[in-house]
């Protein structure tokens, strides 16, 4: 089956790819070295890109995560500018960063299940 992918989905995937390239090749801030973009969603009108990220080996409440969040917020304009230069879009979307807690939540649930299964009755 050959299903066509919607334009917002294609743009979101390309923004994710572009942001990963920028983070790993062009960003010199050491607070962003372990940042990994997990997902990008874009509004239907392509004006807002919601970017979810994690930090390898770090919990959201840890200091390195807080530092990375601040660095991403500070560099939002740079990321938007680079997306505009690298992608052929009529309007460069506003970039909004959010820490992705899915992996942490899954790990916590897995831990709870493990404890429940191995608890002595």
UniProtKB/Swiss-Prot annotation:
According to its UniProt entry, the protein's GO biological process terms are: maturation of SSU-rRNA
Q: Does the keyword Cytoplasm apply?
A: yes
- Tell me which UniProt keywords the record has, alphabetically: Cytoplasm, Ribosome biogenesis
Classify the source by domain of life: Bacteria
Q: Where is it mainly found?
A: cytoplasm
Which PROSITE patterns does the record associate with it? RBFA
Q: What molecular functions are annotated in GO for this chain?
A: ribosomal small subunit binding
Instruction: Give GO cellular component annotations, separated by semicolons.
Output: cytosol
Tell me the InterPro entries matching this sequence: KH_dom-like_a/b (IPR015946), RbfA (IPR000238), RbfA_dom_sf (IPR023799), Ribosome-bd_factorA_CS (IPR020053)
Where in the cell does this protein reside? Answer: Cytoplasm
Describe its partners and assembly state: Monomer. Binds 30S ribosomal subunits, but not 50S ribosomal subunits or 70S ribosomes.
Q: Which family does it belong to?
A: Belongs to the RbfA family.
What is the recorded function of this protein according to its Swiss-Prot or TrEMBL entry? One of several proteins that assist in the late maturation steps of the functional core of the 30S ribosomal subunit. Associates with free 30S ribosomal subunits (but not with 30S subunits that are part of 70S ribosomes or polysomes). Required for efficient processing of 16S rRNA. May interact with the 5'-terminal helix region of 16S rRNA.
PANTHER family in alphabetical order: RIBOSOME-BINDING FACTOR A, CHLOROPLASTIC-RELATED
Q: Which NCBIfam families match?
A: rbfA (TIGR00082)
Protein name as annotated: Ribosome-binding factor A
What organism does the UniProt record list as the source?
Hydrogenovibrio crunogenus (strain DSM 25203 / XCL-2) (Thiomicrospira crunogena)
């Amino acid at each position: 089956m050959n299903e066509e992918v919607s334009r917002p989905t294609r743009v979101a995937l390309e923004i994710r790819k572009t942001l990963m390239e920028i983070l790993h090749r062009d960003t010199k801030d050491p607070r962003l070295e372990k940042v990994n973009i997990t997902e990008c969603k874009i509004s239907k009108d392509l004006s807002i890109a919601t970017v979810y990220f994690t930090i390898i080996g770090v919990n959201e409440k840890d200091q390195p995560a807080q530092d990375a969040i601040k660095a991403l917020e500070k560099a939002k304009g740079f990321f938007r500018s680079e997306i505009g230069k690298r992608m052929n879009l009529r309007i460069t979307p506003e970039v909004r960063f959010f820490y992705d807690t899915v992996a942490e939540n899954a790990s916590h649930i897995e831990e709870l299940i493990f404890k429940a299964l191995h608890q002595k009755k």
